[in-house]
Amino acid sequence: MNSEFVEVAIIGRCVGLKGCVKLHNKGDFPEQFKKNAVFFDKDGNEFIIKSYDVSKETALFEGYEDIDLAKSLVNKILYTTKELTRKNCKLKEGEFFYFDVLGLNIVENGEILGVVKDIEDNLNNALLYVKTSDDLVSIGFAKNFYVPYIDRFVISVSLENKEILTKDAKSILENS
């Protein structure tokens, strides 16, 4: 899969007889699911939403307006591009797209602790999954650790400098 693609939904079961399918949103932007929105599968095939019911989270895709055709979509993963995501999903001040945070250095007091490799959501907040820098691993620190994405630990995020400034993240690493 092209690194410019972002997973946004999984198509669930068929609903009714006219080809509607349940959409399981995998992101933070349900507003991207609307009439004429374009998505892709892992092979780059296009899927265009013909209609979307916000309350039921069901979609009808162009060319799949029949239950037998729609059944072929069940369990298909839908993707969009980073470019379309930036265009269609508006962020509030201080918010970032997950794909922009991946790969940023975790820095504390000028020391690079590691690199963000993944982001996991728990019920209350996101957790940054960090691969510890080789220098720290070589002196006995854990290979990976988590940093809660909350003000207590994250001071600032700079996409320009490719870093997240933290406080007390090293304490988490030391106790991992």
Swiss-Prot record:
Belongs to the RimM family. The gene is rimM. Binds ribosomal protein uS19. The keyword rRNA processing applies. This is Ribosome maturation factor RimM. GO terms for biological process: ribosomal small subunit biogenesis; rRNA processing. GO terms for cellular component: cytoplasm; ribosome. It is found in: Cytoplasm. PANTHER family: RIBOSOME MATURATION FACTOR RIMM (PTHR33692:SF1). The keyword Nucleotidyltransferase does not apply. Pfam families: PRC_RimM, RimM. Disulfide bonds: none annotated. GO terms for molecular function: ribosome binding. Residues 93-172 form the PRC barrel domain. Keywords: Chaperone, Cytoplasm, Ribosome biogenesis, rRNA processing. SUPFAM superfamilies: PRC-barrel domain (SSF50346), Translation proteins (SSF50447). An accessory protein needed during the final step in the assembly of 30S ribosomal subunit, possibly for assembly of the head region. Essential for efficient processing of 16S rRNA. May be needed both before and after RbfA during the maturation of 16S rRNA. It has affinity for free ribosomal 30S subunits but not for 70S ribosomes. The PRC barrel domain binds ribosomal protein uS19. Its main location: cytoplasm.
